[in-house]
């Protein structure tokens, strides 16, 4: 049975939350492109791998509030907490718009706003 885009993202997020970035990357196309609006763009799986290695000092904590699937697109709205290099947890609100191709995550447009720290 073919997984829905929603199920694919849920499995990918579970992998990264468990600290398995490689399993997460298995859900991405080789030419995946991540656009963090107003910040930077990552092109290709290797660029994403390097970003994850640096940004996810510890596995992130996701709190997905809403998932909306339409055709090849999936929008995820929620909260994410990441530990920075100094060991401090930083909270963010996000809206991710994913485009899927042949059952894999091909494109991300991410709107991310820092909401505080712990």
Each model region followed by its residue ranges:
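Short, well-ordered alpha-helical segments enriched in acidic and aromatic residues
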Residues: 18-35
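A beta-strand edge to alpha-helix "cap/lid" segment located at domain peripheries
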Residues: 1-4, 8-17, 35, 39, ...
């Amino acid at each position: 049975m073919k997984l829905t885009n929603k199920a694919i993202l849920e499995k990918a997020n579970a992998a990264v939350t468990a600290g398995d970035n490689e399993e997460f990357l298995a859900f991405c196309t080789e030419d995946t492109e991540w656009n963090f609006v107003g910040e930077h763009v990552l092109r290709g799986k290797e660029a994403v791998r390097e970003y994850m290695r640096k940004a996810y000092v510890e596995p992130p904590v996701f709190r997905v509030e809403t998932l909306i699937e339409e055709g090849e697109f999936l929008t995820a709205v929620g909260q994410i907490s990441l530990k920075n290099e100094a060991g401090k947890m930083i909270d963010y609100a996000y809206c991710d718009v994913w485009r899927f191709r042949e059952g894999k995550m091909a494109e991300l447009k991410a709107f991310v706003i820092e909401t505080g720290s712990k």
